[in-house]
A protein has these predicted regions:
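Short acidic/polar active-site loop segments enriched in Thr and Asp
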Residues: 113
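N-terminal signal-anchor/start-transfer transmembrane helix
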Residues: 8-25
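Loop-to-helix transition at the N-terminal end of transmembrane alpha-helices
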Residues: 29-45
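Short, aromatic-rich membrane-interface segments at the entry and exit
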Residues: 3-6, 30, 55-62
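Soluble catalytic domains of enzymes that build or remodel membrane lipids, polysaccharides, and related
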Residues: 84, 94-108, 116-332
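N-terminal signal-anchor transmembrane helix
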Residues: 52, 58-110, 126-130
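Hydrophobic alpha-helical transmembrane segments
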Residues: 46-54
Length: 332
């Protein structure tokens, strides 16, 4: 019975992993991509338990368990050249959450140059602008009451800012240029695409199309770029990995930790949904998840440093012909 239970658990974990690999956009299949850490922990436990029995099923169970395990990065910044570094904070506030002071206190403590808040309505916009408007005078305000509002606050000069609705009229995104203290220009994209879920969308098409459309633009721009936001997707999903190859962007978390930002209320069910992606022109100063403040997301804080001379140290992902075909099919 013990051996059968181990084998059944192994097969269940393998099934969820296989479902996540199926190239369809149904929400329940895409949901299978999220719990990789939980699956990995259960797989490791199953593998360990399988070693205590001499039953021939052990080898099959162990193989199935280990087949769902896997890993990988952006170079660390060196001291100096602070005028080329951008400390930034990203936070999904959860619209009905009214603990604005919990977030504002953390912003004032860490003093990031860029603050992006998501799910912000008029109430949140007023609270944040009242507290941050003097210290972060460059503001892009897009309040909405549909969970897709966003506000951008900056101490650095911003240029050429546009609020776009790339795929759907009720889903905004922010695009423009950050002017570093050194005078150099960095392209910025801030996104919060609609997720695949029973309440939002039956498929992941809208999310995937928005992400890949911006990724294609980043690749064509070819200059230094940052992409930040709640992407409603995990770092290891097929779509996010396709995005990194198409855009050429790197994930600072790889090789450093999960930095899971959602769900703040469920310790065992957390995934990294809030992202900071960078092109090869950057190095990482520091990265950390901040404190819970009543939202279902934790804020995330990172310092990215513009060091184009170190671009060759980073392993920039590149798309193949199949990737390009996938992008064309998704966008069109």
């Amino acid at each position: 019975m013990f051996d059968l239970a181990i084998f059944a658990l192994s097969m269940m974990l393998l099934a969820v992993t296989v479902f996540a690999k199926i190239r369809l956009r149904d929400w329940w299949l895409r949901a299978c991509e999220f719990p990789r850490v939980q699956i990995a922990c259960l797989a490791a436990l199953t593998a360990a338990l399988a070693t205590v029995t001499d039953d021939p099923w052990r080898a099959y169970s162990l193989t199935a368990s280990l087949s769902v395990l896997a890993v990988q990065q952006l170079k660390a910044a060196e001291p100096g050249h602070e005028d080329r570094c951008v400390p930034l904070l990203v936070s999904n506030v959860l619209t009905p959450n009214r603990n604005s002071q919990g977030l504002i206190t953390q912003i004032l403590e860490h003093q990031p140059d860029i603050v992006l808040t998501l799910e912000t309505d008029d109430w949140w916009g007023e609270k944040l602008q009242s507290a941050l408007g003097e210290g972060w005078p460059e503001i892009v305000s897009v309040p909405q009451d549909n969970l897709y509002g966003m506000h951008l606050f900056s101490r650095l000069e911003l240029q050429g800012l546009e609020v776009k609705r790339l795929i759907q009229d009720d889903i905004p995104s922010i695009h423009g240029w950050i002017i570093l203290k050194s005078g150099e220009r960095i392209r910025l994209h801030a996104l919060h695409p609609r997720p695949p879920s029973p309440q939002e969308s039956d498929t992941s098409l809208w999310r995937d199309a928005e992400l890949l459309l911006v990724g294609k633009e980043i690749r064509e721009h070819a200059g230094p770029s940052l992409l930040i936001g709640d992407l409603n997707d995990v770092a290891w999903s097929r779509t996010t990995k396709l995005f990194t190859r198409v855009s050429g962007m790197l994930d600072p978390r790889r090789g450093r930790g999960m930095f899971s930002t959602f769900h703040a209320g469920h310790r065992l069910l957390r995934w990294p949904l809030d992202h900071i992606f960078v092109t090869e022109h950057f190095t990482l100063g520091q990265m950390q998840r901040l404190k819970e403040f009543g939202s279902d997301h934790f804020p995330i804080l990172a310092t990215l440093c513009y060091h184009p001379s170190r671009s060759d140290e980073n392993d920039t992902p590149r798309p193949d012909a199949e990737d390009k075909a996938d992008v064309k099919e998704t966008i069109h």
